[in-house]
């Protein structure tokens, strides 16, 4: 019996019809007890939790309470948002409310400091 090379086998398969190749694959699965189904790649897992933690770069400034100095907080809210007196008053009185969305860390901390100095309770989210 002549020894078949990989090249001979590949040429023989290349000359086969698609149906014959499917039958050949099925026969090989039965004979060798394997499956030709693709194996799913294992999920990529970060080496450490530090790789997963991403520092947030945009913050929402949330007014949680206006405290005892409502007028001072309304004035500060007006200067931060550019709203009119009535709109700023309504916003402050509807606390908890977002005063500024998508602020940078420095800007958000500055707004938080200003509002807290005016007597408000503020959270950064």
Swiss-Prot record:
Record keywords, A-Z: Ribonucleoprotein, Ribosomal protein
InterPro entries associated with the record: Ribosomal_bL12, Ribosomal_bL12_C, Ribosomal_bL12_C/ClpS-like, Ribosomal_bL12_oligo, Ribosomal_bL12_oligo_N_sf
Keyword Translocase part of the UniProt annotation: no
Biological process per Gene Ontology, one example term: translation
Family the entry assigns: Belongs to the bacterial ribosomal protein bL12 family.
Assembly information from the UniProt record: Homodimer. Part of the ribosomal stalk of the 50S ribosomal subunit. Forms a multimeric L10(L12)X complex, where L10 forms an elongated spine to which 2 to 4 L12 dimers bind in a sequential fashion. Binds GTP-bound translation factors.
Protein name: Large ribosomal subunit protein bL12
Lineage summary: Bacteria, Pseudomonadati, Pseudomonadota, Gammaproteobacteria, Candidatus Pseudothioglobaceae
């Amino acid at each position: 019996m002549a020894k078949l090379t990989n090249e001979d086998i590949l040429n023989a398969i290349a000359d086969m019809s698609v149906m014959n190749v499917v039958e050949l694959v099925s026969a090989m699965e039965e004979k060798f007890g394997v499956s030709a189904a693709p194996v799913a790649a294992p999920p990529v897992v970060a080496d450490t939790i530090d790789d997963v933690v991403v520092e947030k770069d945009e913050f929402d400034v949330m007014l949680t309470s206006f405290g005892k100095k409502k007028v001072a907080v309304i004035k500060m809210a007006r200067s931060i948002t550019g709203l009119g007196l009535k709109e700023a008053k309504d916003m402050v009185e509807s606390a908890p409310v977002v005063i500024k969305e998508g602020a940078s860390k420095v800007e958000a901390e500055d707004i938080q400091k200003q509002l807290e100095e005016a007597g408000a309770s503020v959270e950064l989210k």
